[in-house]
UniProtKB/Swiss-Prot annotation:
It comes from Geobacillus thermodenitrificans (strain NG80-2). Pfam families: DUF1292. InterPro entries: UPF0473 (IPR009711). NCBIfam families: PRK13678.1-4, PRK13678.2-4. Belongs to the UPF0473 family. This is UPF0473 protein GTNG_2486.
């Protein structure tokens, strides 16, 4: 994972690079980890309904000249916490649109 201001380059298991935009990051004191919500910048990332799939990973930030590292979500408890954060984010976005 390479960091830009609001973009990261994600490398998949096949070695393909994909430019993604960071939606937001947060830290969890309960799990002692940082998390990032991101989505692919390319138009091909949209599904048949025109929706863009958002991904989430734990991450270890890199130093100034080093790449960071994306990590998988490991437990059901982490997924529950992430879902709660996502639902709060979506509710706040909807309130802002009204």
């Amino acid at each position: 994972m390479e960091h830009g201001d609001r973009h990261i380059t994600v490398v998949d298991e096949q070695g393909n690079e994909q430019l993604c935009e960071i939606l937001f990051t947060f830290e969890s004191d309960d799990f002692g980890k940082s998390y990032v919500f991101y989505y692919p910048v390319s138009a091909e990332a949209e599904d048949e309904d025109g929706e863009t799939e958002v991904h989430v990973s734990a991450f270890i930030p890199g130093d100034e000249n080093e790449e960071g590292e994306l990590l998988p979500i490991e437990t059901e408890e982490e997924w529950d916490m992430i879902e709660e954060v996502w639902n709060t984010f979506c509710a706040e976005q909807e309130e802002g649109e009204e």
